Design a protein with these regions (language model features):
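ER/Golgi luminal nucleotide-sugar-dependent glycosyltransferases, focusing on the catalytic module
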Residues: 1-204
Length: 204
């Protein structure tokens, strides 16, 4: 999403980098982009989906995942969900993926948000420990599960940012973990950084 309805140079850099290591790249935009803007990334993507800005990033991912469908999803070794809220990459992505392939996990993300007993910010009793949604990766075992697709089929298209965080981002990790899937962050220090800094907006 871009409030100016443009694809920035930073976005192009990210998309180009992703295209070099992903077999297929679906670009979903919640912005009203002109064809001249979409042309900037067309050499790098398999498909472009232009939609209204409903549901924020989870609304966009929901539409793309349901469009792909269960049969297509299970063909992939991994599914990466990411947005443009953080610039990437600074270091080669291959190194990150290689290191995480050595870990015995079913899904992972760049950073993790620690458990907080006070969930008033998201209108919940607590905030569960969860992978931050700006970059997450799911393996074939997760993609083939009923719990993964059920989540995307059943989540409403929330209009409010807090509702998205409270009902989607902060809950999805726990839903998958409760189903027996194992997860880990790439940046292990993110368990402690936001607690030490007393800034729970890290890395933003």
């Amino acid at each position: 999403y871009d409030k100016k309805n443009v694809i920035s140079e930073e976005d192009i850099t990210s998309v180009c980098a992703y295209s070099k290591i992903f077999d297929a790249l679906v670009f979903v935009t919640n912005s009203d982009l002109k064809n001249s803007e979409l042309e900037k990334i067309k050499p790098y993507v398999s498909k472009c989906i232009c939609r209204e800005n409903k549901g924020l990033d989870f609304g966009a991912w929901k539409e793309a995942i349901l469009l792909l469908g269960r049969e297509k999803l299970t063909e992939y070794d991994e599914l990466v969900l990411c947005n443009n809220s953080c610039f990437a990459p600074i270091f080669p992505l291959e190194k990150m993926f290689y290191e995480m392939e050595q870990e015995n996990v079913d899904f992972w993300g760049n950073c993790i948000f620690p458990y907080l007993p006070d969930g008033s910010y998201i209108h919940k009793d607590c905030i569960p420990e969860h992978l931050q949604s700006y970059f997450t990766v799911y393996n074939k075992r997760v993609l083939s599960s009923n719990v993964f697709l059920k989540f995307w089929e059943e989540i409403p298209v929330y209009e409010n940012y807090i509702d998205v965080v409270g009902n989607c981002e902060s809950q999805f990790t726990k839903i998958l973990a409760d189903a027996g899937f194992i997860y880990s962050p790439y940046v292990k220090e993110s368990y402690y950084i936001c607690q030490y800094l007393q800034n729970y907006s890290v890395p933003y």
